[in-house]
């Protein structure tokens, strides 16, 4: 079957777009805006990045820590110190998510809880980042506190992200909490999805 003259490939279509002056101008504006935002973000993070570099953690953005499998325990005290500083939401979220490791619990659990309690649900990015950090940093020694946070409806939909920390525990109170939280409209969908995922075809 032959391709008609009106049919073009994606590559051909993109080449035609590149030749369109309006498209090229819009693309240049988008790229310029992206470069500007990246430069502003690097400038805003400069103090944090210098502090990290001083302990041997060399990254171009705090989000590099979120996306690495390498250990950076030495950086945790610095991240905790900067978590409460007046950064933009995107950077604060990155700091919070970088603290989402088990080694944070012994040195920074109270800081994470305090920041989670203080952050309004309307600040979704930071609130979610802190919830992820709490869930990943938690262990059985703070299980009761994690459950209490998940039950507090004033914390909004970010509570869904706390559930993985509760689910990970094998303690009876964790299972009881999950059963109770399954009745919460904001959490029930996530909890019921676990049950569906655990079913095996016969």
Identify the function of each model-found stretch.
Residues 1-55:
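Intrinsically disordered, serine/threonine- and proline-rich low-complexity regions
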Residues 12, 18-21, 116, 147-150, ...:
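Generic low-complexity, intrinsically disordered sequence content enriched
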Residues 25-37, 50-72, 81-85, 90-104, ...:
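Structural detector for internal amphipathic alpha-helices that build alpha-solenoid repeat scaffolds
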Residues 39-51, 72-85, 104-118, 139-151, ...:
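Amphipathic alpha-helical scaffolding segments comprising HEAT/armadillo-like alpha-solenoid repeats
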């Amino acid at each position: 079957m032959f391709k008609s003259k009106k049919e073009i490939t994606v590559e051909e279509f993109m080449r035609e777009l590149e030749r369109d002056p309006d498209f090229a101008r819009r693309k240049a504006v988008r790229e310029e805006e992206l470069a500007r935002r990246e430069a502003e973000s690097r400038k805003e993070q400069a103090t944090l990045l210098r502090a990290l570099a001083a302990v041997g953690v060399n990254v171009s953005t705090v989000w590099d820590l979120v996306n690495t499998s390498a250990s950076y325990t030495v950086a945790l005290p610095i991240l905790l110190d900067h978590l409460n500083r007046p950064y933009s939401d995107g950077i604060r979220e990155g700091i919070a998510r970088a603290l989402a490791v088990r080694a944070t619990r012994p040195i920074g659990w109270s800081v994470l809880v305090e920041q989670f309690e203080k952050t309004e649900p309307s600040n979704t990015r930071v609130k979610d980042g802190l919830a992820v950090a709490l869930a990943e940093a938690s262990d059985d020694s703070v299980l009761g506190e994690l459950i209490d946070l998940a039950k507090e409806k004033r914390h909004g939909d970010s509570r869904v992200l706390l559930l993985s920390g509760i689910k990970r525990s094998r303690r009876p109170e964790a299972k009881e909490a999950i059963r109770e939280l399954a009745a919460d409209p904001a959490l029930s969908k996530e909890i019921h999805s676990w049950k569906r995922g655990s079913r095996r075809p016969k």
